[in-house]
């Protein structure tokens, strides 16, 4: 089976800083694939590059068999690839419902069944649908960012640090929701500093250090890796 997303030997720069150095990985349909590593390892830069916010100096990025390496973000979204960015980035002065509707912008309409689906996954958002998004808690804003991404029925969802800044209880809830999305057939590329949580729900993972992939394997294999335990799991 051909990979849904295929990243091959990409090199990405911030000015003269070589942030991503020859990274290659694949995401197959129905998988959760995680990128783990310390701050500054290049994880978020890779997501920005895949979503078109940055462009690689060299290398290829294929999504559903099409080259998207130098495509603009608005074009990439129409292909079925959405990015839930680090820091949630909700429209603070718009209502919860208006934020959710924005997720369907590329469809040109707001499908009622999609609204019902996200409210069934995130009942707390339904209760707060008329509330300004900026007044939600951090966990609720993360749920809203995820709900907004789901509105366009994407083929691949990329999530950048979904547990950042959340309480342990909310972290559990967010990872439970991500696992449920995978069970319902979603394909997810996850960037997460909480390696323990990420590896427990992921099918495959890649470890990044200073812009390079240094390890890869199944979630279980990396959880049991002594190198990963020492570096990321407190072992």
Segments (PLM) and residue ranges:
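Glycine-rich phosphate-binding loops of nucleotide-dependent enzymes
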Residues: 2-235
């Amino acid at each position: 089976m051909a990979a849904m997303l295929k990243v091959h030997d990409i090199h990405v720069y911030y000015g003269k800083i070589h942030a991503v150095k020859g990274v290659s990985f694949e995401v197959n349909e129905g998988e959760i694939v995680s990128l783990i590593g310390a701050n500054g390892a290049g994880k978020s830069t890779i997501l920005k590059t895949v979503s078109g916010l940055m462009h690689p100096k060299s290398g290829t990025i294929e999504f559903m068999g099409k080259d998207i390496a130098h495509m603009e973000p608005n074009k990439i979204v129409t292909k079925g690839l959405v990015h839930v960015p680090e820091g949630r980035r909700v429209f603070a002065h718009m209502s919860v419902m208006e934020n959710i509707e924005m997720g369907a912008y590329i469809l040109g309409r707001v499908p009622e069944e999609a609204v019902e689906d996200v409210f069934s996954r995130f009942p707390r958002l339904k209760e707060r649908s008329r509330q300004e998004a900026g007044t939600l808690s951090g966990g609720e804003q993360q749920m809203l960012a995820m709900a907004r991404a789901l509105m366009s029925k994407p083929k691949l969802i990329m999530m950048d640090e979904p547990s950042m800044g959340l309480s342990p209880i909310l972290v559990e809830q967010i990872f439970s929701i991500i696992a449920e999305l995978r069970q319902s057939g979603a394909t997810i590329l996850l960037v997460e500093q909480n390696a323990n949580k990420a590896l427990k729900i992921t099918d495959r993972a890649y470890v990044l250090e200073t812009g390079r992939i240094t390890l890869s394997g199944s979630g279980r294999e990396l959880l049991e890796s002594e190198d990963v335990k020492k570096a990321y799991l407190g072992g």
